[in-house]
Amino acid sequence: MIKFEWDTTKATSNKKKHGVSFDEARSVFYDEFAVQFFDEDNSVSENRFLMLGFSDEARLLIVCHCEREEGNIIRILSARKATKNESHYYQGIGP
């Protein structure tokens, strides 16, 4: 079973800035067609990943996260609605 964690202050600011709660963001990990990418540009102190998929509110989101070594824990760092290019990629239209 996957466990999720996040900083509550960051979750509040993310909701204000992007209109996406981390509760909604975690549902993206259950989209069977979600695509995960390694986020090389932001993986300085830890490996970060981007998950692109549909939430349980039928919104296509991109979720930045890292995976904790202790247990099966995903730490959500940020989440936002996917851009037009990201949407095309998810739909198989883009590069």
For the regions a protein language model found, what residue spans apply to each?
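Ribonuclease/tRNase effector modules and their secretory precursors
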Residues: M1-P95
